[in-house]
Each structure stands twice: as C-alpha cells, then as structure tokens.
C-alpha cells in the first residue's frame, strides 16, 4: 500500500526544482497492463505545458497543494491566401496556408486553501495549466499513455 503524504509532496517538488522542465511526474499505475493513467504531477511556476487535448477521454484534475489555473481553449482554424502576385498560380495549386490559433474560453482556478479542489476537463477539450505557486496535482485519464 502506498500513502500520499506531505513527505512525498515535498520530495516531488524538490525533484521538480532539479528538472529543467520545472515539473515532476509520479506514476501511480500498479502494473504494465494497467489501462488507465493515474499520476501525481509536481508543477512549478514558469513550467511550460503546451496546449493539448485528449481526444478519447475526460481528464480529472485534483489539486493537492498550491495554486494554479486550468485553462480551456477553442481551436480557431483559418486559411491564409497567398500574396496577390502569386494568387492565380497558387489558387490552381490549392496553396493556402492553414493557421491554427487558440482562444481562451474558460479559466478554472484551483487552490485547496480556497476550497477549489479540482475539475473535470471534457473529452477533446484543448487545455493547458498555468502554475501560480508550486503545486502538486492528481491527474486521471482513461486509456494507456501514448506519447
């Protein structure tokens, strides 16, 4: 049996300080055949978590300590046409540039000291995390990890 306690939290935050990514993951799965993702993630301010999504599963996030924002986005896709001098030639070649941007639609503040403990991120939602102070979160998702 494993206990998630203050000693573990302190150790994970210390490891995150030594990690160039300013975060440290702790896998809670119990066997290689486990088909879920359960982990603790120690996150420090200025860590960069790219905007991403999980197409086939919701994600549950519980903040054990610290303060952070889960930020949800809409994906905005546009197509830029070529410059006017090459327009006709490019039209024939279907040479448009696809441009993807993300527009913030929701910000969920997590801070256990303020009784704001967690959130559930919907399947397919684009999201990231912005860390305000050193934090440790519990994350859970269906399915095995795919890099």
PLM region spans:
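Short hydrophobic/aromatic-rich beta-strand segments that constitute the beta-sheet cores
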Residues: 50, 70-72, 139
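Conserved short histidine dyad/triad with adjacent acidic residue
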Residues: 40-55
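Short, surface-exposed charged micro-motifs
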Residues: 40, 60, 128
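Conserved metal-binding segment of the jelly-roll/cupin
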Residues: 46, 110-133, 140
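Long cytosolic regulatory regions associated with cyclic-nucleotide signaling
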Residues: 91-102, 116-118, 135
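A short, N-terminal "cap"/entry segment at the start of jelly-roll beta-barrel domains
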Residues: 1-37, 50, 80-93, 102-110
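Glycine- and acidic-residue-biased ligand/ion/polar-headgroup-sensing regions
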Residues: 56-77, 90-98
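A short beta-strand-loop micro-motif that forms or neighbors metal/cofactor-
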Residues: 64, 130-147
């Amino acid at each position: 049996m494993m206990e998630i306690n203050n000693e573990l939290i302190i150790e994970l935050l210390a490891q995150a300080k030594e990690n160039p990514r300013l975060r440290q993951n702790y896998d809670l799965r119990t066997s290689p055949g486990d088909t879920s993702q359960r982990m603790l993630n120690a996150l420090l301010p200025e860590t960069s978590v790219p905007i991403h999504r999980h197409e086939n599963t919701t994600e549950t996030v519980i903040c054990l300590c610290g303060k952070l924002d889960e930020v949800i986005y809409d994906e905005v896709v546009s197509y830029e046409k070529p410059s006017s001098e090459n327009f006709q030639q490019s039209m024939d070649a279907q040479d448009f540039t696809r441009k993807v941007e993300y527009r913030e639609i929701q910000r969920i503040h997590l801070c256990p000291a303020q009784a704001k403990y967690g959130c559930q991120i919907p399947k397919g939602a684009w999201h990231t995390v912005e860390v305000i102070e050193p934090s440790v979160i519990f994350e859970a998702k269906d399915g095995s990890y795919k890099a």
